[in-house]
A protein has these predicted regions:
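Generic structural hydrophobic/aromatic packing signal, biased to beta-strands
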Residues: 17-19, 40, 47, 84, ...
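Extended, compositionally biased non-globular segments
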Residues: 143-145, 149-270
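A general structural signal for short secondary-structure junctions and capping/turn motifs
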Residues: 7-10, 37-39, 84-89, 129-130, ...
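Solvent-exposed N-terminal domain segments of exported/luminal and surface proteins
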Residues: 1-84
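A signal for specific C-terminal beta-sheet/loop modules enriched in small/flexible residues
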Residues: 61-73, 110-126, 131-139, 162-178, ...
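Core of folded catalytic or high-affinity ligand/protein-binding domains
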Residues: 43, 52, 57-114, 142-143, ...
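Extracellular/lumenal glycan-associated surfaces
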Residues: 41-45, 90-103, 230-250
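A short, polar beta-strand/turn micro-motif
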Residues: 1-35, 98-154, 249-261
Length: 270
């Protein structure tokens, strides 16, 4: 157990989900999602977006401003997010908020050895990529569309174009003018067991804005694309993790669209 100040423990869970398989389709019906699982990964762990909702920051008395949501990934130290990118909630259910598990935890025979899909082919010994470098399916969203790792073709409809890392189209707002005056980027909160935490840029979901074509993906962190699994094309989500010297853009499981349009925790494509 290593969840910092998070007092919760992981307990065994038996999940049974009915998912309508929409892989191979491109049918859109966008809507908000509630807090909770948005999909499930091949290792049985639930996928969620990065929103921690509008509850007070753990170990403190400070709630986010009305209409804002804390970002559990950016504030991972307060939420007890581990090296896999997840943590348990009060009922003992463990879930991922972001994609560290793919490079910190999955490159082991204990994970990819349980499923022949990951063992059949590899790209430079990376068993979570097809032989041409395209990512493999690592889970399914509950709307029925597949979730891939971060690599896909430069041109979504041309397998002969180079494989590149998919990037989010969400960008950190350069200043805190969208926040209330008492919640600027230098806002400091005292957290029990940790000390002072600065609610810097990215601490709130609403610190990000969608910029069309800023990255390779749409506002749901997906796109319609040809893949080795679906040569005729499918809509698919992509797990993205990308950082640079200026800002952390996105290191999340499905989408950072969560909460952008209000009180809800996320958006789905279907």
């Amino acid at each position: 157990r290593s969840f910092g100040v998070n007092p919760n423990f992981i307990t065994p869970k038996n999940y049974k989900f009915k998912i309508k398989n929409r892989a191979g389709e491109n049918t859109a019906n966008p809507h908000k999602t509630e807090l909770g699982g948005m999909g499930i990964f091949a290792n049985g762990v639930l996928a969620t977006n990065p929103s921690a909702g509008d509850h007070k920051l753990p170990g403190s008395t400070v709630y986010p401003p009305i209409g804002f949501n804390y970002n559990a990934v950016h504030l991972g130290i307060a939420y007890g997010v581990d090296t896999g990118g997840g943590h348990p909630e009060a009922n003992g259910s463990y879930h991922y908020h972001e994609g560290s598990f793919l490079y910190n935890n999955w490159h082991t025979s204990k994970i990819y050895g349980v499923n022949s899909y990951y063992n059949l082919t590899n790209f430079n010994e990376d068993k979570f990529r097809h032989i041409d470098g395209h990512s493999k399916i690592i889970g399914y969203c509950f709307d029925g569309y597949p979730i891939y790792g971060p690599y896909s073709y430069t041109t979504s409809t041309d397998v002969n174009t180079p494989v590149i890392q998919m990037t989010s189209s969400y960008k950190l707002l350069p200043n805190a003018n969208h926040r209330p005056k008492d919640f600027r980027y230098d806002k400091v909160v005292e957290v029990e067991g940790i000390g002072n935490i600065t609610l810097s840029a990215g601490s709130l979901i609403q610190d990000y804005e969608f910029k069309d074509s800023y990255g390779t993906l749409d506002r749901y962190n997906g796109r319609y694309t040809i893949t080795p699994d679906f040569p005729n094309g499918t809509y698919a989500y992509f797990l993205t993790f990308e950082k640079d010297d200026v800002e952390t853009r996105v290191d999340y499981t499905i989408t950072i669209a969560s909460g952008v349009n209000g009180h809800g925790s996320g958006n789905k494509y279907y």
